[in-house]
């Protein structure tokens, strides 16, 4: 975009081509722990009826063998997106026997660390790489933190829209990547608002913290919380408390610098990890001793993404073909929704991301990192509902409700454009529903959860188990149509066959495969 171009002029151009917004795409990856009837982490293998966790495109596992990940395709509207997510939940429940999907971001009752099962993907080199990477996560961060779950929201805008927003770019790939990186800068500035409006993890089971020191208070004998927290999941209880991750400050001023720093993190040894080593008792325990084993280890609330081929590294794919979409990673599971996310939340996120894409997005002056934005985010996840809370907007203090209302006013035209493109007024209503939360913090999901714990007089674990059972009953009461069920079953069958094919086609040992995978990483800018 030109130096004299403004958000107002870009919005004006967008209004003339609002129909292009119908080509926006969104997809969801929703995590959820399998638990037994008592709400304890399931220690059973990934059910065979769900297919291969390595190759089934609908259902896989994340860190633990018990941490399900339900994946949708991409959709042009929210309604079919959530319909697919609901169908996948129904399919999973048609297979689960005496188990439930834990419908909270903060984990169920966990066994001792040694007994938390790491996800297993079979004996192919591809599967073993995923498994060993997870062994490394256990060494670096502990297993309990890896059992935290969330909703990842993938979002893209059509190339024709980027051309309207940035007509002066040299080529479509540069334009698209520049646009998404600008979106990410604004997301970094304003994502505290998402945590206030949708954060739903202010409490957790005491057992989760174990013997670790923490700032949490006791709500009851079994529940820890912070009185004004919105999302303990996104607080410094986890990755951000890790020294290697904490010192890693990537640059969001341009894609090339972002990739150069990410490349540095996956190639630079870290002393503590060197002390651990890559092998113990003849077994691989981490892929390497670098700051990050692979790119996906980097902890962030949003990522630039590009689909990769087999054995292709994300840094290489992004460097060669540019950003394809963004992955929003800060959404907590909505415990009131059977599928973990409400339609209004998805619509608001769409409008919010479009606002981030079109609004002015100055470079971050601190070498491409914005400490002020990180501080705002951190304070909101831990005390976002605190009366009189002030945030830092460009060095000037402003109250959270005042800034939030201003942002909603700025987002409103983008919600209206989605309604214009898709018909109806669902986006405007989704945005309007958020105003009440800024005027009344008790209306936020985090406040409602704490109020229900107090009103019902039950600990977090019991409350969450009751809710998860209720959602399971509702989903099981509406079985899939026969043809849809058959489609899921066939995908599961084919995934087992594909895993077997991969295991039979390996022509090198695992050590060689890991070396090749590391060698596939190209420095950005190299050919």
Curated annotation (Swiss-Prot):
Keywords tagged on the record: ATP-binding, Glutathione biosynthesis, Ligase, Nucleotide-binding
Transmembrane domains' residue ranges: none
Enzyme class: ligase
Keyword flag ATP-binding: yes
A single Gene Ontology CC term: cytosol
Pathway noted in the entry: Sulfur metabolism; glutathione biosynthesis; glutathione from L-cysteine and L-glutamate: step 1/2
GO biological process: glutathione biosynthetic process
Reaction catalysed by this enzyme: L-cysteine + L-glutamate + ATP = gamma-L-glutamyl-L-cysteine + ADP + phosphate + H(+)
Pfam families registered for this protein in UniProt: Glu_cys_ligase (PF04262)
E.C. numbers: 6.3.2.2
Molecular function, one GO term: glutamate-cysteine ligase activity
Membrane is among the record's keywords: no
SUPFAM superfamilies named in the record: Glutamine synthetase/guanido kinase (SSF55931)
Family designation: Belongs to the glutamate--cysteine ligase type 1 family. Type 1 subfamily.
Protein name: Glutamate--cysteine ligase
Taxonomic classification: Bacteria, Pseudomonadati, Pseudomonadota, Betaproteobacteria, Burkholderiales
